[in-house]
Amino acid sequence: MNKLIPVPREFFARDTNVVSTELIGKALYFQGKTAIITETESYIGQNDPACHAARGRTKRTDIMFGPAGFSYVYLIYGMYYCLNFVTEAKGFPAATLIRGVHVISPENLYLNGPGKLCKYLGINISHNKCDLINNNEFFVGDIGLKLPYSTTARIGITKGTDKLWRYVVTDITNLISQYNVQP
């Protein structure tokens, strides 16, 4: 694989659903580990009842109102971290949750679930508000991989379940052929 280069901030500063779908097949690089993003979910603004910013700006959600291309990491159930990327224009709270990845380096490993991927990668609350653009240790890179995906309702939430804002890879043939991953 060629040297990974972070995608530009403009990549994240767009419609959240566009970003969520285009993150599928991108490489997530974190402190020496590389994983292909295989599942995402969108959380969009104050009219989305499942979005953390639905009730307005708080200390916790402040990062969602900031510029795009930053990490938003939080704890759920008192034990699992979740990784999100801030999207859209500054002042509009939105983010993409990274729900699943396929690790390609240093080993071959499929991780389904935001808690599993954060635990494996070592992502925790100290990685909240990281700039993903000007960062050599934590970023998203485009490796030119296109993977087919399906659109479904978001999972693990109780509000906004009618939104078809979950995107999950349906066929990893390209991933297998290019990176010799095991299904």
UniProtKB/Swiss-Prot annotation:
One Pfam match, given by its short name, reads Pur_DNA_glyco
Q: Which CDD domains match?
A: AAG
- Mind telling me which SUPFAM superfamilies this protein's record contains? FMT C-terminal domain-like
Q: Which UniProt keywords apply?
A: DNA damage, DNA repair, Hydrolase
Provide the family line: Belongs to the DNA glycosylase MPG family.
HAMAP family recorded for this chain?
Answer: 3MGH
Its recorded name reads: Putative 3-methyladenine DNA glycosylase
Q: Which organism is it from?
A: Rickettsia africae (strain ESF-5)
